[in-house]
């Protein structure tokens, strides 16, 4: 039997085609795409991608919309942190 690929991993299916830099980018994206993520509802690491932008937890059966390749996008993380910061400022202003 032949040895499995160590360096190329998932992108071994492309062989020598498309160039090494593009295959490295694809490898990074495909690893994120096929990974399991932490469910925000039940706390288990069971959320997987069903199709583009739709993620489903296998434990609690919840469906969540997110990024195309990863559960959260940088823009969504920035927006969420901004909302949390503004809520804290509003609460502090009401207390004073």
UniProtKB/Swiss-Prot annotation:
Gene3D superfamilies: 2.20.25.30. GO terms for molecular function: structural constituent of ribosome; zinc ion binding. SUPFAM superfamilies: Zn-binding ribosomal proteins. GO terms for cellular component: cytosolic ribosome; ribonucleoprotein complex. The keyword Zinc-finger applies. InterPro entries: Ribosomal_eL37/eL43, Ribosomal_eL43, Ribosomal_protein_eL43, Ribosomal_zn-bd. The keyword Transmembrane helix does not apply. Signal peptide: none annotated. Pfam families: Ribosomal_L37ae. It is found in: Cytoplasm. It comes from the Eukaryota. NCBIfam families: eL43_euk_arch. Component of the large ribosomal subunit. Mature ribosomes consist of a small (40S) and a large (60S) subunit. The 40S subunit contains about 32 different proteins and 1 molecule of RNA (18S). The 60S subunit contains about 42 different proteins and 3 molecules of RNA (28S, 5.8S and 5S). PANTHER family: 60S RIBOSOMAL PROTEIN L37A, LARGE RIBOSOMAL SUBUNIT PROTEIN EL43. This is Large ribosomal subunit protein eL43. It comes from Plasmodium falciparum (isolate 3D7). The lineage of its organism: Eukaryota, Sar, Alveolata, Apicomplexa, Aconoidasida. The gene is RPL37A.
């Amino acid at each position: 039997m032949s040895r499995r690929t160590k360096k190329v991993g998932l992108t071994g299916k492309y062989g020598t085609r498309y160039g090494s830099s593009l295959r490295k980018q694809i490898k990074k994206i495909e690893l994120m795409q096929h990974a399991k993520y932490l469910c925000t509802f039940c706390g288990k690491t069971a959320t997987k991608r069903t199709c583009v932008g739709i993620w489903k937890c296998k434990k609690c059966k919840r469906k969540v919309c997110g990024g195309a390749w990863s559960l959260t996008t940088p823009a969504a993380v920035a927006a969420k942190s901004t909302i949390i910061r503004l809520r804290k400022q509003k609460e502090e202003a009401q207390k004073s």
